[in-house]
């Protein structure tokens, strides 16, 4: 089964996944960074995590959300740079920030990148790989958990993606 087919199946089955696990984000972030360390090492990228927070949701889906964001950050970052992920609680929300040192996302595309198959630049997809579903999946997972994702900052020196999740379960979650 191709990577694209697997991702499409994941997206179609999201609503059936129970979302009531208590999740400590620091250990999950460390697991994601460990799993992506070989990819980062190929480019000489340092992975850094800071902070901790707790949320309620699907540990499988939150892992996928974090994995996709960090994997994108590694792919688009310059060699020998740093990818940083921060987690913190702010009131009744959890804020997750993934910062890379890549080419940035032009302002006119900062909402379009969450649409399935959208590409800022076709040459980027050839250079960096992927099928254009990773950020769409992240958007769906965040929304399913009562949260959101946005480009918080972006310039030619890198991008910071911000995911906001509730710290407690929503009545609509399974």
What are these regions (language model features)?
Residues 100:
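Acidic ATP/Mg2+-coordinating residue in the GHKL
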């Amino acid at each position: 089964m191709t990577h694209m087919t697997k991702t499409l199946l994941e997206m179609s089955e999201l609503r059936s996944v129970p979302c009531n696990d208590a999740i400590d984000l620091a250990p999950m972030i460390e697991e994601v960074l460990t799993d992506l360390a070989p990819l980062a090492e190929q480019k000489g990228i340092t992975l850094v995590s800071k902070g901790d927070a707790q949320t309620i949701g699907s540990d499988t889906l939150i892992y996928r959300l974090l994995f996709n964001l960090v994997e994108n950050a590694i792919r688009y970052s310059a060699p020998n740079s740093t990818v940083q992920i921060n987690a913190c609680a702010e009131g009744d929300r959890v804020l997750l920030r993934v910062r890379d040192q890549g080419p940035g996302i032009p302002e006119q595309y900062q909402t379009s990148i969450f649409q399935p198959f959208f590409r800022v630049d076709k040459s980027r997809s050839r250079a960096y790989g992927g099928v254009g579903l990773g950020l769409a999946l992240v958007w769906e997972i965040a929304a399913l958990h009562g949260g959101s994702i946005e480009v918080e900052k972006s310039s030619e020196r890198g991008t910071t993606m911000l995911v906001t999740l509730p710290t407690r379960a929503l009545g609509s979650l399974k």
